[in-house]
C-alpha cells in the first residue's frame, strides 16, 4: 500500500511517499525545480516519488494534502474581523486577498484529485499543524510524547499542542493568531534587512554576535530609563530582551500574547510595528520607500537580534516547562518553522527538563508532506507504527553511469576511482592539502540541511578556511558559523550533544578537550557559551561519509571536517549530477567528488 503526502498550498512545497516498508521517498519541489521556496503543487517532487517506487498514480491508495483551505480561510476571516476596528481600510482588501488565496488553494485540491484519478486514489485535506505534529511524533522513537508545532500562521493559526501515544495523536491546545512568535521573528528579520520567510536563520546567527557583547549594567539602566519615559532602550542587548518580553507578554494558554501597544496590522494584513516600538528601539519610523538596512545601524541590528533570540528562548522554555508539569510527559516532539532554530532547540533541551527531545529534521513546511502521509497511514488506515525515521536521505540517487553521461556531455575532465577506498584516499589528499571539496554521494537529503550527501567539505585546520569558503564559494555573511562534522563514536571525547545532533537541529557544547581543540582553529567555530554547530555522523546513516571523517582524522588532531551545503548563493541544495557540475564550475570549490569520479581545478 502507498500513501502520498503533499505540501501543496504555501511555500516550501514537497512530496513524501510511504509504503509498507516505511518511507520510500521524500523531496522538496524547490530542489528539483531549482527555485527557492517553491509554492503550489509539487509536480516534480511527485514525479520523483512515484518513479523511485516504480509505481503509477493508480497504485496510490490515499493522497494527503497538508492544508484545509476552507478552515484556514474561516480562521483568517475571524482573525481579521477582530482586527477590523483597528484597521478598517484594510479589511476589504484582506477579504479580497484571502478569497483569492482560497480559490487558488481549492483549485490546487481539484487539480490533485484529477492527477490522482479520484476516486481510485482518494484525496484527504488535513490540518497544517496536525501534519507538522505528525511529522515529529511518528518519526520519533517515542511510544508517548508531548507534541508541539509552532510556525507563523499555518492554516490560520499559530500552533498546536497534542499528545501522541502509539498510533494516536490528539490535540489538547490550539494557538490562535496573531499571537505567533514565528510571525514576530519574521517581521524582525524584515526589519533587520533580511528576507522574511527565508532569512530567519540569519537573524538567529546575528544574535550570537551580541552574546557576551555590550554592557549588561548599561542595558539594565536603559530599561529603567525607558520605563520612566526615556526615548530609547538601545543601550544594549539586555534592554532589547526586556523590550521583547514586554512586547510578547506571556500568558498561561500560549507561548506568547502580543502587546497591542507595539503591533499593528498592515494594509495587506501583515504584522508590523507601531510608532511606540520604533521610539523604544531608538530607530526611525519605517518610511514607505526605504530598506531596513538604511534604517537600522549595524550595532542596533545585533542588539535587536540578540534581544529577540533571548526573549524567545525565555518565553518558550517557561511555557514548555509549564506544559511538561501539566501533562506529566517525559518526551517532547517538535516541528514547525520556529524549530529550525538550533539555538532555540539547544535552550529547550538544556532548560525545560524533558528526558527526551526529538526535532523533525524537515521542521518547515516541507515536512508537513511527510506528516500528512504518516497521519493517514496510522489514523485513517489503522496501520502499525512505522519505525523511527532512519535518516534524512530520501532524495534522488545516481549511478556512476548516470554521472558519467553528464560529465561527458559537459566535456569535463575527470579521474575515475575504481573503489570506495581509492575515492576516500583521493578525498583525504585534497582535504589535507587545504582544498575545498564538493561531495556528491548517494541519495540527496530531505530537509534544509546538508548532511554529507550534498556537501562542501574542508579541513578546519586549513589556513583561511572560513574566509575562502565565504569569499570564493558561499558568498555569505561572515557572522554565520560553519558546522563541523564528527563520527558519532568520537563525539563524546570533545563535545556534549543530544541525539538531535544527528540532523544538525541543535547545538553541541565543547567540553574541556573540545575547547582546547577548537581554540587551535580559526575564530568562529567555538561560539559564545562554548557552543558549536555539530553534525554527529552515524555509520548506519551515511557509512561513506562516516568513513571519510575517520580517514581524514588519521593525520589530523581529530576526525573533524567543515560541512556546509553544496549550492550556489541564492539557490537550493544541488540534487542532480548536472546541478553538481554547474555549481562546482560556477563556484570557487577546488574539487568535486561525484560518485567515483574526481574533478580537480588546476
Predicted segments with their positions:
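Phosphate/pyrophosphate-binding loops at sites that engage ATP/ADP/AMP, CoA/4′-phosphopantetheine
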Residues: 47-61, 116, 320-328
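Short acidic-aromatic active-site loops that bind/stabilize oxyanions
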Residues: 98-102, 123-126, 294, 298-314, ...
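Phosphate/ATP-binding catalytic cores across multiple sugar-kinase/actin-like superfamilies
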Residues: 306-332
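N-terminal phosphate-binding loop and adjacent alpha-helix
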Residues: 31-55
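Short beta-strand-loop/turn "lid" adjacent to the catalytic site in phosphate-handling enzymes
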Residues: 56-109, 134-135
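Conserved residues at the C-terminal ends of beta-strands
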Residues: 63-66, 335, 360, 595
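Flexible beta->alpha loop and helix N-cap segments adjacent to enzyme active/binding sites
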Residues: 2, 8-28, 33-36, 86-88, ...
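Short HxH-centered metal-ligating active-site micro-motif
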Residues: 44-53, 63-67, 548, 556
Amino acid at each position: 500500500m502507498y500513501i502520498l503526502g503533499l505540501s501543496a498550498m504555501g511555500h516550501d512545497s514537497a512530496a513524501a511517499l510511504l509504503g509498507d516498508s516505511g518511507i520510500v521517498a521524500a523531496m522538496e519541489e524547490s530542489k528539483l525545480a531549482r527555485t527557492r521556496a517553491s509554492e503550489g503543487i509539487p509536480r516534480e517532487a511527485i514525479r520523483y516519488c512515484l518513479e523511485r517506487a516504480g509505481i503509477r498514480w493508480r497504485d496510490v491508495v490515499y493522497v494527503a494534502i497538508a492544508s484545509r483551505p476552507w478552515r484556514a480561510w474561516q480562521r483568517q476571516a475571524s482573525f481579521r474581523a477582530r482586527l477590523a476596528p483597528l484597521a478598517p481600510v484594510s479589511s476589504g482588501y484582506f477579504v479580497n486577498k484571502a478569497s483569492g488565496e482560497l480559490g487558488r488553494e481549492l483549485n490546487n485540491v481539484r487539480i490533485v484529485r484529477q492527477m490522482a484519478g479520484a476516486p481510485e486514489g482518494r484525496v484527504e485535506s488535513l490540518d497544517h499543524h496536525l501534519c507538522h505534529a505528525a511529522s515529529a511524533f511518528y518519526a520519533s522513537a517515542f511510544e508517548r510524547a508531548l507534541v508541539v508545532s509552532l510556525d507563523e500562521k499555518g492554516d490560520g493559526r499559530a500552533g498546536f499542542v497534542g499528545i501522541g501515544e502509539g498510533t494516536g495523536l490528539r490535540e489538547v491546545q490550539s494557538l490562535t493568531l496573531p499571537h505567533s512568535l514565528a510571525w514576530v521573528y519574521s517581521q524582525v528579520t524584515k526589519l533587520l534587512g533580511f528576507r522574511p520567510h527565508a532569512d530567519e536563520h540569519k537573524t538567529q546567527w546575528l544574535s550570537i554576535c551580541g552574546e557576551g557583547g555590550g554592557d549588561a549594567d548599561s542595558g539594565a539602566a536603559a530599561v529603567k530609563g525607558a520605563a520612566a519615559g526615556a526615548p530609547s532602550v538601545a543601550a544594549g542587548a539586555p534592554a532589547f530582551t526586556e523590550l521583547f518580553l514586554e512586547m510578547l507578554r506571556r500568558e498561561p494558554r500560549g507561548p506568547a500574547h502580543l502587546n497591542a501597544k507595539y503591533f499593528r496590522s498592515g494594509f495587506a494584513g501583515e504584522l508590523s510595528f507601531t510608532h511606540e516600538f520604533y521610539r523604544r528601539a531608538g530607530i526611525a519610523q519605517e518610511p514607505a520607500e526605504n530598506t531596513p538596512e538604511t534604517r537600522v545601524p549595524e550595532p542596533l541590528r545585533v542588539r535587536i537580534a540578540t534581544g529577540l533570540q533571548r526573549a524567545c528562548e525565555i518565553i518558550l522554555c517557561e511555557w514548555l516547562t509549564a506544559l511538561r508539569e501539566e501533562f506529566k510527559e517525559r518526551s517532547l516532539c517538535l516541528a514547525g518553522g520556529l524549530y529550525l532554530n538550533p539555538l532555540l532547540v539547544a535552550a529547550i533541551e538544556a532548560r525545560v527538563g524533558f528526558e527526551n527531545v526529538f526535532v523533525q529534521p524537515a521542521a518547515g513546511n516541507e515536512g508537513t508532506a511527510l506528516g500528512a502521509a504518516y497521519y493517514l497511514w496510522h489514523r485513517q488506515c489503522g496501520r502499525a507504527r512505522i519505525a523511527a525515521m532512519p535518516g534524512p536521505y530520501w532524495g534522488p540517487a545516481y549511478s556512476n553511469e548516470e554521472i558519467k553521461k553528464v560529465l561527458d556531455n559537459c566535456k569535463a575532465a575527470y579521474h575515475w576511482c575504481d573503489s570506495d577506498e581509492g575515492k576516500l584516499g583521493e578525498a583525504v589528499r585534497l582535504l589535507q592539502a587545504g582544498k575545498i571539496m564538493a561531495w556528491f554521494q548517494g541519495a540527496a537529503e530531505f530537509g534544509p540541511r546538508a548532511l554529507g550527501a550534498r556537501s562542501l567539505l574542508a579541513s578546519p585546520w586549513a589556513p583561511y578556511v572560513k574566509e575562502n569558503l565565504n569569499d570564493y564559494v558561499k558568498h555569505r555573511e561572515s557572522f554565520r558559523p560553519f558546522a563541523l562534522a564528527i563520527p558519532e563514536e568520537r563525539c563524546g571525547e570533545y563535545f556534549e550533544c543530544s541525539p538531535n545532533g544527528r540532523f544538525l537541529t541543535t547545538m553541541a557544547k565543547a567540553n574541556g578537550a573540545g575547547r582546547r581543540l577548537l581554540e587551535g582553529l580559526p575564530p568562529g567555530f567555538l561560539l559564545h557559551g562554548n557552543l558549536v554547530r555539530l553534525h554527529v555522523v552515524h555509520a548506519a546513516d551515511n557509512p561513506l561519509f562516516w568513513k571519510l571523517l575517520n580517514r581524514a582524522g588519521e593525520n589530523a588532531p581529530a576526525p573533524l571536517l567543515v560541512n556546509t551545503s553544496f549550492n550556489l548563493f541564492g539557490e537550493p541544495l544541488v540534487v542532480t549530477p548536472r546541478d553538481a557540475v554547474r555549481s562546482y564550475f560556477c563556484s570557487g570549490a577546488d574539487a568535486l567528488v561525484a560518485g567515483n569520479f574526481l574533478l580537480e581545478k588546476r
